[in-house]
């Protein structure tokens, strides 16, 4: 009887979308396609206060980590880790860019003007201020997705076979390369081409190790060419 009750509870959680998908259906990281004819430098975005349009070509020569963020997500704590990552790897040429989005569980419901105060006083709270650039809230999937996210998604295979629970995903049409949840990450290289894509549940510490490993390989190749 106890086992039956336990199984019933687990099924209810699965149907509600609170239990993670099988690890066999997802990968922590995917390498992006090579030989892309265009780069991220063809795009740009408005800062979260709406006062400045930043062309991404401004980051030429840098490694750029694109992250779709949300203030009321179970992964919002990653903000603190991303701050640490930005501080630690900035000397090696890493720039983190955050893009608030409300398409996953409606977990970024506020206006642009409310996002920074929410981060400071609510989640993560404790006076938290991101040390990386945040941009205006927008879509990363669907009919109104931002064009640079179309480019990133088409450049890199998805990390999971399944999109997730449809009643918690708010866009149409749904496509195989779509972002699965808040805090999915894309790394773009110094030449503007996408390199890696990470599953949202991949820890920031693992993302850091992957980035450092790639940087070391590139540095070694540079030495060999000399």
From Swiss-Prot:
GO CC terms: extracellular space
GO MF entries: glutathione peroxidase activity; identical protein binding; selenium binding
Entry keyword Magnesium: no
Keywords: Oxidoreductase, Peroxidase, Secreted, Selenocysteine, Signal
Record-annotated active site: 73
Locations listed in the record: Secreted
Reaction equation(s) it catalyzes: 2 glutathione + H2O2 = glutathione disulfide + 2 H2O; tert-butyl hydroperoxide + 2 glutathione = tert-butanol + glutathione disulfide + H2O
GO biological process: hydrogen peroxide catabolic process; response to oxidative stress
Family per similarity comment: Belongs to the glutathione peroxidase family.
Subunit structure: Homotetramer.
Protein function: Protects cells and enzymes from oxidative damage, by catalyzing the reduction of hydrogen peroxide, lipid peroxides and organic hydroperoxide, by glutathione.
Name of protein: Glutathione peroxidase 3
Organism this protein belongs to: Hylobates lar
């Amino acid at each position: 009887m106890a086992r039956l009750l336990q199984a019933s509870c687990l099924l209810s959680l699965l149907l509600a979308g609170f239990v993670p998908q099988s690890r066999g259906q997802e990968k922590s990281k995917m390498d992006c396609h090579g030989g892309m004819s265009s780069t991220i430098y063809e795009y740009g975005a408005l800062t979260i206060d709406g006062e400045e349009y930043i062309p991404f070509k401004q980051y030429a020569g840098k490694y750029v980590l694109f992250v779709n963020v949300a203030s009321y997500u179970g992964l919002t704590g990653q903000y603190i880790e991303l701050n640490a990552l930005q501080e630690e790897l900035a000397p090696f040429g890493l720039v983190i860019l955050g893009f608030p989005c409300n398409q996953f569980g409606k977990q970024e419901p506020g206006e642009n003007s409310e996002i920074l105060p929410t981060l400071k006083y609510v989640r993560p709270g404790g006076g938290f201020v991101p040390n990386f650039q945040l941009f205006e809230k927008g879509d990363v999937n669907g009919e109104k997705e931002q064009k640079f996210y179309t480019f990133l998604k088409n450049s890199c295979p998805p990390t999971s076979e399944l999109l997730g629970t449809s009643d918690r995903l708010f866009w149409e049409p749904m496509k195989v390369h779509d972002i699965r949840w808040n805090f999915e990450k894309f790394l773009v290289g110094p030449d503007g081409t996408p390199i890696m894509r990470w599953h949202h549940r991949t820890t920031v510490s693992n993302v850091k190790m992957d980035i450092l490993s790639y940087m070391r390989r590139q540095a070694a190749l540079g030495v060999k060419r000399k």
